[in-house]
């Protein structure tokens, strides 16, 4: 992760800037929360539809980066998660 002043660059498309959306992860140049897009991906929404819903403010490459970073974070922190079995 690189920093540019107080802005954290997590990749080519994803940033955390305290001056934008209180430092939440957003797509560079937008106020679109990475979390919102990842929730849309998780719900099964087609990526093309997600892009259209955000008026083409994000790209397929940006969504790919978000999914890759989320995957990496999960794999790096797996031991911190404790899942309770679902009741049958």
List each language-model region with its residue ranges.
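Long, low-complexity intrinsically disordered regulatory regions enriched in P/S/T/G and acidic residues
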Residues: 1-2
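Long, charge-rich, low-complexity alpha-helical segments
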Residues: 33-88
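A short, structured beta-strand/loop element
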Residues: 8-49
């Amino acid at each position: 992760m690189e920093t540019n002043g107080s802005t954290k660059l997590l990749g080519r498309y994803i940033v955390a800037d305290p001056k934008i959306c209180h430092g939440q992860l957003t797509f560079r140049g937008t106020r679109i929360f990475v979390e919102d897009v990842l929730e849309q991906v998780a719900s099964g929404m087609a990526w093309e539809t997600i892009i259209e819903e955000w008026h083409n403010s994000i790209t397929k490459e940006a969504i790919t980066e978000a999914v890759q970073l989320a995957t990496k974070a999960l794999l790096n922190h797996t031991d911190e998660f404790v899942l309770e079995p679902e009741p049958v």
